[in-house]
From Swiss-Prot:
InterPro entries: RuBisCO, RuBisCo_large_chain_AS, RuBisCO_lsu_C, RuBisCO_lsu_C_sf, RuBisCO_lsu_fd_N, RuBisCO_lsu_N_sf, RuBisCO_lsuI. The basic functional RuBisCO is composed of a large chain homodimer in a 'head-to-tail' conformation. In form I RuBisCO this homodimer is arranged in a barrel-like tetramer with the small subunits forming a tetrameric 'cap' on each end of the 'barrel'. PANTHER family: RIBULOSE BISPHOSPHATE CARBOXYLASE, RIBULOSE BISPHOSPHATE CARBOXYLASE LARGE CHAIN. Gene3D superfamilies: Ribulose bisphosphate carboxylase, large subunit, C-terminal domain, RuBisCO large subunit, N-terminal domain. Pfam families: RuBisCO_large, RuBisCO_large_N. Its cofactor is Mg(2+). The record marks K334 as: Transition state stabilizer. It is found in: Plastid, Chloroplast. This is Ribulose bisphosphate carboxylase large chain. It comes from Nephroselmis olivacea (Green alga). Its EC number is 4.1.1.39. RuBisCO catalyzes two reactions: the carboxylation of D-ribulose 1,5-bisphosphate, the primary event in carbon dioxide fixation, as well as the oxidative fragmentation of the pentose substrate in the photorespiration process. Both reactions occur simultaneously and in competition at the same active site. Mg(2+) binds at K201, D203, E204.
Length: 475
């Protein structure tokens, strides 16, 4: 019997290490409509050619490994391998490049964000030849989009459920975020909803701690919702956080919320995980619950401009996994959010079709096919003086979330809610009349103060509050 080495030689196998670019750098490749496309910001180690780094990213996130293996001959690498098909230097940076990589559709399990991310943002981010690597954008092909359910309901269905049209929605995160008893928590919920808000929200930190177990919180919040609805004649909701230590416990909390008859629940999709989030989204569609998504942990992943994952990619992942709301930053509050970049991923959340626009950080044209849109949630250090800018920036299909900007009102929670509602309706009316909120917004708010003492008091408290810092992540 011939030695194994002779058999390998006859089959064309040659052991050893060869440059990735010999196999995975293919600048002549014609991208297919079914491909998943990725734009990576690469910082190669000194002395490593960008072509080799781009090819390494394509290889290590698809079929490649560090050495030639004889089992390559048992499959079709041309069919399954990722390809670095283009490189471009990053303007203003000495050693950064955008590497464009195309992945065949068959590399990914249908309907699984978990599998998609395991491949594309897996071990390759620890690759030694790279000093830093950031996933800037993904193009999700229509063929792959059609394997996902997406949002449980979407923007239009939510408006129909709430019977609220023609303005943005108002919310408030209950503060202090930790330490309240369930009864006192429910009292704050009632006061905010009674004062004019559409929603109140569990802070992402609130799960089921010793000071307030989840079942008690759900019961007192449901009581608050029904009382506020009866007194205002409006449909109200509270984002009951179903996030838990296990998927089974998460679904148990969702079931209890459904039994209480509340309209909406909440999940932390990054800390809870994509698999758990997708399971919850399926449950919510089947049972008529809206799903509010918080992005706790996102800044660990997306804030550094040369390493990690840009939030526009995390937003796309959520649109696939499923959620009716997603926190998106504010541009004007205390949390990170550069205007054009924020508007770029807000459009990616809401619109069915978004054209490539590098001025807003959108690297690929994205067609979402029939996936429902996700409502952006603006929250973090915002108050009534920000309302003109928020209405101008986000339009009507957004939820404006005032936590301290409601509960910090000098007269209490209900007046704080009333101040926000008056400010929102005044700005919406002014916009509808053709007024320029960017230029006249302050005048609109001051005019409304004349007939709303609650708004006047809020304006006096927060007239000097600003959060003006340079953004860390810029184009």
């Amino acid at each position: 019997m011939a030695p194994q080495t002779e058999t390998q030689a006859k089959a064309g196998f040659k052991a050893g290490v060869k440059d990735y670019r010999l196999t995975y750098y293919t600048p002549d490749y014609q991208v297919k409509d079914t491909d998943i496309l990725a734009a990576f910001r690469m910082t190669p180690q000194p002395g490593v050619p960008p072509e080799e780094c781009g090819a390494a990213v394509a290889a290590e996130s698809s079929t490649g490994t560090w050495t030639t293996v004889w089992t390559d001959g048992l499959t079709s690498l041309d069919r399954y391998k990722g390809r670095c098909y283009d490189l471009e230097p990053v303007a203003g940076e000495d050693n950064q490049y955008i590497a464009y990589v195309a992945y065949p559709l068959d590399l990914f399990e249908e309907g699984s964000v978990t599998n998609l991310f395991t491949s594309i943002v897996g071990n390759v981010f620890g690759f030694k030849a790279l000093r830093a690597l950031r996933l800037e954008d993904l193009r999700i092909s229509v063929a792959y989009c059609k394997t996902f359910q997406g949002a449980p309901h979407g923007i239009q269905v939510e408006r129909d459920k709430l019977n609220k049209y023609g303005r943005g929605l108002l919310g408030c995160t209950i503060k202090p975020k930790l330490g309240l008893s369930a009864k006192n928590y429910g009292r704050a919920v009632y006061e905010c909803l009674r004062g004019g808000l559409d929603f109140t929200k569990d802070d992402e930190n609130v799960n089921s701690q010793p000071f307030m177990r989840w079942r008690d919180r759900f019961l007192f919040c449901a009581e608050a919702i029904y009382k506020a609805q009866a007194e205002t004649g409006e449909i109200k909701g509270h984002y009951l956080n179903a996030t838990a230590g296990t998927s089974e416990e998460m679904l148990k909390r969702a079931v209890f919320a459904k039994e209480l008859g509340v309209p909406i629940i909440m999940h932390d999709y990054l800390t809870g995980g994509f698999t758990a989030n997708t399971s919850l989204a399926y449950y919510c569609r089947d049972n008529g619950l809206l799903l509010h998504i918080h992005r706790a942990m996102h800044a660990v992943i997306d804030r550094q401009r040369n390493h990690g994952i840009h939030f526009r990619v995390l937003a796309k992942a959520l649109r696939l996994s499923g959620g009716d709301h997603l926190h998106s930053g504010t541009v004007v509050g205390k949390l990170e959010g550069e205007r054009e970049v924020t508007l770029g991923f807000v459009d990616l959340m809401r619109d069915a079709y978004v054209e490539k626009d590098r001025s807003r950080g959108i690297y690929f044209t994205q067609d979402w096919a029939s996936l429902p849109g996700v409502m952006p949630v603006a929250s973090g250090g915002i108050h009534v003086w920000h309302m003109p800018a928020l209405v101008e920036i986000f339009g009507d299909d957004a939820c404006l979330q005032f936590g301290g900007g409601t509960l910090g009102h000098p007269w209490g929670n209900a007046p704080g809610a009333a101040a926000n509602r008056v400010a929102l309706e005044a700005c919406t009316q002014a916009r509808n009349e053709g007024r320029d909120l960017a230029r006249e917004g302050g005048d609109v708010i001051r005019a409304a103060c004349k007939w709303s003492p609650e708004l006047a008091a809020a304006c006096e408290v927060w007239k000097e509050i600003k959060f003006e810092f340079d953004t860390v992540d810029t184009l």
